[in-house]
Every structure is written in structure tokens, then in C-alpha cells.
Amino acid sequence: MKVIIDSAIPYIRGIVEPYADVAYMAGAEITNDAVRYADALIIRTRTKVDATLLENSNVKFVATATIGSDHIDLEYCKRHGIKVCSAPGCNARGVLQWVAATLRHLVIKDCCTPQDYTLGVVGVGNVGSLVAQYARHWGFRVMECDPPRQEREGGDFHTIEEIAKECDIITLHTPLDTTTRHLISSTLIEMMRPKATIINASRGGVVDNRAVLHSDHRYAFDVWEGEPDLDPDVLAGAEIATPHIAGYSVQGKANATAMCIHALAKFFNLPLMKWYPDGITRPTPRLISWQELCQTIPSHYDISAESNELKTLASEFEALRNNYAYREEYF
């Protein structure tokens, strides 16, 4: 069996080698020629998985060490009997702590308290539900928008138009598909409250970046249209700008790698179903107060410094992302 693995995936080297011929490659080097005789791929978002990559190959299993799969042509894989696995929820607490750092930055800059804001959470899955839970605990008034969940469950969800009209801050945690591409459009932006802030740690295409740039709204982006080639005007106008690393925590990366290994083990019947990286501490999740958050998060994560670095080194987006020092989760 031959397995090709993205060389930027952490903690994975040496794990599959006892059971397969393993080749490590940069995401951009994983091409049709490279995968022709591979049985399995373990990739990241930098590898687009479609007919161009997979045609006339032996690939029958693809795992992505990411929560989303919009870089994978799922219909093609289904038609050709290729198993696809992702890592939903793996980095939820890492993203939560990125959003927390962003909220702290905004609230302190405005000389306000959480009680002064209505926060709209769009996409209430693994990440969004955590953000909503903690934001309520911190004192924000929270409104939730999740049409698929509303259709399945009913409940107290709001439309995206209601979110736009009532919220001071909107934070996005949706997948990218035909229903969410440019969900934040020029039309929706016109409905938003004056000076409202948009936070995007989901997928770049969920927001029409140029429409936001030409509005009077603040925005904090971890994900960008066209990345790694950022629009310099959009980057310069951001209140907070980071290189697609919101979920880059030690634990989040360990979880993603473990989920890929477990999926590979299940599909190929390998004795790795209980594997987890050695030496990784799994923190006990806990609610912390707004006061504790404001006092402690700067020593764990200086988001302003990180934002300044990206604005200074925009052309190094990919290097900043690939060489990122993973953060430790602490709540």
C-alpha cells in the first residue's frame, strides 16, 4: 500500500510507515503524476482533490486534516468509490480562542463591555456553538443563525437578515458551499448596523471581501478570498488580519492528525484506531470569566502582534501559515 501525506501535517511522521510505503510532499506537489500509484492521500486545503488530481489513479481513500472539505470534489469521489474523511470539530477550541482574542481587542478598543454588544453567530456547529456559549457567559447578547439546524430542529434561530439588522458584531462559522458563498454580500452589508464588525474565521469565500472593503464596516479576517495571494487593499483595511491560523492550536492539530489516522486505520484495517500524538496535553474545558480572559489571553496569544506581522509580510502568507508556532489551548 502506498500513502501520500502532506509534509506540513504535524505529528504524523513515522506512524504509518510500519504498514505502508509513505511519501511526504508539499501540498502543491501532490499532482496527478505523484498520486497515480497511491492508494491513499492525507492532505490539507492546499491540495485540490478532483478529476484533475485523481483521474487514472489508484486512490481509493482521501483524508483531509481540516474541518471543511470544500477543496474536495465530493461528487467525483462518490461516483468513483473513493472514501473521503475530514476532521470536523478538531480545532473548535482553537478557533474559539482566536475569536475570544478578537472580541477582547474590539471591546477594549471601543472602551466598552460585552453587555454593550449584540453578537450574531452565523453557523452554530462545532465552533459556532462554543462561541455562542462563551459569549453569553461573558455578557454579550447572542443571536444565532443556522438555517440547516433550524430546518432540522426548529428552535430560536434568526435569519441572516435579522442578524444583519440587529447585531453589532457578526462572527461567521459556516462551511463554504453554494448556499454560503458571498453570504456576506453588498446587499446584506447595506442592511447592517452602522459601523458593525464582521469576523470571519470560516472560509474566505463566505464574505465578498471587496464589498466589505468599500463599506464603512470593521472586519477581522483569518480567511481570505484568493489566499494565499491576498488583495493588498483588503489586507490593509482589516482591523485584525491573520494567515488562516485561527484553529492552529497544539491540541487542534493533534486532533486533526489523529482523526485522519483513525479513518485510515478503519478503512485499511490497521492497528492504529487508538493512536494519539505522544506528549500532547489535553486541557480540561472550562468557562472563564471576561475578566480572566482579558487578563490572561495576551500572554497566550498576542493577536495584534500577529496581525501586524501579516500586514508587514503579506507576500509570506504561506510561509507564516506553514511555519506557525501552534498555540496551547487553555480553556
Where are these regions (language model features)?
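Phosphate/diphosphate ligand-binding glycine-rich loop within oxidoreductases
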Residues: 40-111
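Oxidoreductase and adenylate-handling cofactor-binding alpha/beta cores
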Residues: 96-110, 137-140, 238, 257-266
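A short helix->loop->beta-strand "cap" motif at the edges of active sites that frequently abuts
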Residues: 56-60, 80-82, 140, 194-196, ...
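Glycine-rich adenosine-cofactor-binding loop
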Residues: 96, 115-136
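Rossmann-like adenosine-cofactor binding region
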Residues: 49-50, 149-233
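N-terminal glycine-/charge-rich "phosphate-binding" loop or analogous flexible N-terminal tail
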Residues: 1-38, 143
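Rossmann-like dinucleotide-binding domain for NAD(H)/NADP(H)
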Residues: 195, 201-331
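NAD(P)-binding Rossmann-fold cofactor-contacting core
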Residues: 10, 137-154
